[in-house]
């Protein structure tokens, strides 16, 4: 059987299942025949065949086997074939071939004895075939005939398993599956052919279109020139025959987005329109022409129809590009765009995260947006506003000026301060205020146009925020790399002291003589005068303690300060602007002579104006960014553009009232009444807050803000100036010219505003004409309680008219301040009457001591005998200050302007020689420098002068400070006695009419003169200034 299998493989490897019975081996064993192939027999259909016959028949039947494979099999074969063998046709062919072969008849005669045995075996085989069912055919495996019956059961199990696995199909299903498979193959081949044909047609069509548009085959010159491999530029230039390019206005920054959008629109329109295509040839934009997109089309109407309804495109603003400008428009330029990849670093251009570093996590398919990984800036609702009506939290939109510092998201803080807006997705993912936070980072989408992708140089601090948690960033390596990069970009100037770090001159020091881009010339100390050249990376600047340096590169560029420490190439200095210690690489510093803590336009502790109502104090000055503390005490960082102006404190006239009612002004020293009792100098006063600078506090550059009612004044500039000693009072040259001592001036009111509790009338719009009372004053604002209704309003105190409690004529605030808060009183009589009606207009009230008059009346001491304002019916005859009026006297020149009707009437007194101040007239007796004493007794002719002798000059005669011949001593008695003597007859300047020790002494403050001689006429009413005539119009 093995030989049969091998020969069948040679015969075109055609498998004929079950053509050989399994009884061959049993026949060989029973007869013990020879091993030759001729002795072996095969039983098919009850007849014997040799293997040679089988070999011959196999070759002849190769075609029939192929026909059997291709021909479909019936599920029910013929009856004869079923009884004899599964394949009856092959057996019949084998029998015919065996009959024709007559050469083997001798062998058949030799084996006649075995016919009976073979018949028995054949019967058994037929019975076994009848019992067996038709087995499934295998399409994939070539299964040979089995000779052993013991393995039939195993075959059935194996075949059934193969059927289940799908390797073998049943015979009844084979025809349908084969037919369906052939149909599928045919359809697939047809589809592939159609696709290939369509693709070929499209390629030919596209080639023809390009040939029509850009082909130059019709140009003979072009073909001739291109044969040599050179094409002149004039053939590449556009002409009037080419398509027309139109420039269309669009929103700046949307150019690339609109090009992609219009291109998709063009494709969609082409699909919907079928064979009729839209005549749009190209759409492009140029980076150097912002706000413009370019469309290539033959007609303007096509463009209008194409861009109609597209947002951000201004279709009515189109411009035809001239032919001569097309080459410049289409000239290729090197693009400076950076390819964006996942993981690239970018910076945000706008919003609260402006200039913050971010990492690209995802990029959209249209390359217009990117999902960024950002370090969040959150305050967790600390600055939110609460609506008083609904009592609901209203999120305050953060701005760049008031943004919080960058920190990773803290779910614990969010849960404690703003639980309502926090949602937990998992242990790593949180949603807070509609934004996603994963592992503490914010993931947010931004448009590409709002990202800065060029020259991104992250700092070590920024990189540590992104990589320190995962440990995937080597900060030490990055720092070393940045140091090398900074060293390569170091700036050396002639005169800088440097140290050599590498090479043979390592450790040597010298001075830079010349600098270039890469090489520095240094003159080393201890070497020859010749300068040596060194690369920049091998040099380092040298600074000494106490040097004043300025940062010339890096994050703190522009800062200046005093060097405190130099170690390992790092310089630590205290900043003049922030008063903080900064450590900078030595190569990024430069020695400077300027130590002024000024940066840009604003300096440290400057008072700046943020808005019309808000001011702030600069506590840290930079070039473009400033750190301030506002009037509410909040510390914020603002840009230079956020500051409106600088307030000139020297010209500011602002004040406040402390807790003790004293006035506080700029420059005063105050101390807190409660709390830490901080003390400092007032920098500025703003509404209900004052800015104070303390020298003992380092926080916020020593500036803090408090309410003025919580402080008390320690020292005031005005108080110190007013309490200073006036040396001019003891100057004898000035004292000799001084007039009589004046009454004690009223102490100036300090602290309490003069407008407080005054009745006022409003002069500004809104409440004009209404009356009220001042309840509180704060700076320039006054709180008024209206009389008409129970309402308090705040208004400028200079827009009020102030009245007394009785009414009368109103005055302004400045007049009220000049009057020390006294308002004019009302009178029962006419307004020009100075005294009440119960005082007689001409009555004389002679008293020796001064009296305090009620109200604000002008008359002084003993002035009621003729010293009133002219009354009605007097025709101006009575002087408003004394006797007869100058303007209403009897004769021209006869009456004194300040005196009485007669020439000898005293200005300040009553009649004649009556002194204004009580005794003899100050200006009455003889000369103003030598007449009767202003302070002596009256009634004497040419009484003793206070400053001179009896009838002598004020610079002669009696000494003011001693007793000389010719007059009475001013300080002593009369008759050449000492001023301190107690002799009789001496008229004391400070005495009374009659002393206890001296008889006849008369006081300068004493009574009126008892004598009416011509010597005691008033200096203001006598005939001559040195005699008796009045200087203001006395008698001739």
Curated annotation (Swiss-Prot):
Its main location: nucleus. Residues 1-189, 383-403, 892-919, 966-1036 are annotated as: Disordered. Residues 33-44, 89-98 have a biased composition (Low complexity). GO terms for cellular component: DSIF complex; ribosome. Residues 102-126, 143-160 have a biased composition (Acidic residues). Residues 67-81, 179-189 have a biased composition (Basic and acidic residues). Component of the SPT4-SPT5 complex. Interacts with RNA polymerase II. It comes from the Eukaryota. The keyword Transcription applies. This is Transcription elongation factor SPT5. The gene is SPT5. One of its GO terms (molecular function) is structural constituent of ribosome. GO terms for biological process: mRNA processing; regulation of DNA-templated transcription elongation; regulation of transcription by RNA polymerase II; transcription elongation-coupled chromatin remodeling; translation. The SPT4-SPT5 complex mediates both activation and inhibition of transcription elongation, and plays a role in pre-mRNA processing. This complex seems to be important for the stability of the RNA polymerase II elongation machinery on the chromatin template but not for the inherent ability of this machinery to translocate down the gene. Pfam families: CTD, KOW1_SPT5, KOW2_Spt5, KOW4_SPT5, KOW5_SPT5, KOWx_SPT5, Spt5-NGN, Spt5_N. It is found in: Nucleus. Belongs to the SPT5 family. Residues 976-998, 1006-1021 have a biased composition (Polar residues). Signal peptide: none annotated. Keywords: mRNA processing, Nucleus, Transcription. SMART domains: CTD (SM01104), KOW (SM00739), NGN (SM00738). It comes from Kluyveromyces lactis (strain ATCC 8585 / CBS 2359 / DSM 70799 / NBRC 1267 / NRRL Y-1140 / WM37). CDD domains: KOW_Spt5_1 (cd06081), KOW_Spt5_2 (cd06082), KOW_Spt5_3 (cd06083), KOW_Spt5_4 (cd06084), KOW_Spt5_5 (cd06085), NGN_Euk (cd09888).
